[in-house]
Curated annotation (Swiss-Prot):
One biological process term in Gene Ontology: amino acid transport
PANTHER family, A to Z: ARGININE EXPORTER PROTEIN ARGO (PTHR30086), ARGININE EXPORTER PROTEIN ARGO-RELATED (PTHR30086:SF20)
Chain segments annotated as transmembrane: 15-35, 67-87, 89-109, 128-148, 161-181, 195-215
InterPro entries: LeuE-type (IPR001123)
Molecular function terms from GO: amino acid transmembrane transporter activity
Family: Belongs to the LysE/ArgO transporter (TC 2.A.75) family.
Domain of life: Bacteria
Designated name of the protein: Putative amino-acid transporter YisU
Key words of the record: Amino-acid transport, Cell membrane, Membrane, Transmembrane, Transmembrane helix, Transport
Protein topology in the membrane: Multi-pass membrane protein
Amino acid sequence: MTISLMIEKKCERSFFSMNAIIHGIVLAFGLILPLGVQNVFIFQQGALQKHIWRALPAVISASVCDTLLIVLAVAGVSVIVQELPVFETVMMAGGFLFLLYMGWVTWNIRPNTSQNEKHTFTPKKQAAFAAAVSLLNPHAILDTIGVIGTSSLQYSGLEKWLFMAACIAVSWIWFISLAIAGRLFQTIDTSGRLMLIVNKCSAAVMWAAAGYFGVSLFCN
């Protein structure tokens, strides 16, 4: 009887652990999949760098930022952040100015030209820009902290750690995959014409996001 109960409890715990992992994976993909400035930037760096490993500063920076936000969310910081309206205003203003500049830089990138080296981001610049597009987006931050933080409340102990680890793993895998996809895209686009269109569209996405932040600031 005792052995039977032990087996039953072990199976039950395994079920809840697997449920936490699957929940984390599905939730993280749902938050990270939509087209945004962060995704566009990582894809772009994968395409613009001569070798895929040269895009690692952007990938690592974005992944570390997401990891930090996820850890803070599970740690319960969402409650504090949501009680500080000034936080959203400051982040929105910073995001507005940064995205205007970032859009201008992206618009002027010319793939496969003599000036390509001039516009290729250095490792430090990649890391800084990736961190900026990750952290200067108040809505993305509040969504990540709020949704993941709230969802993590139903778990405790090992299940909470597994849920958090699953969310973090999805983030790293996704950004690595985006950079690889960008590199593959560049190998197909030998003329650079498609990449030029991608750059223009990327700049448009950044300016649209900046415009949204500007309207939100004005309305508030």
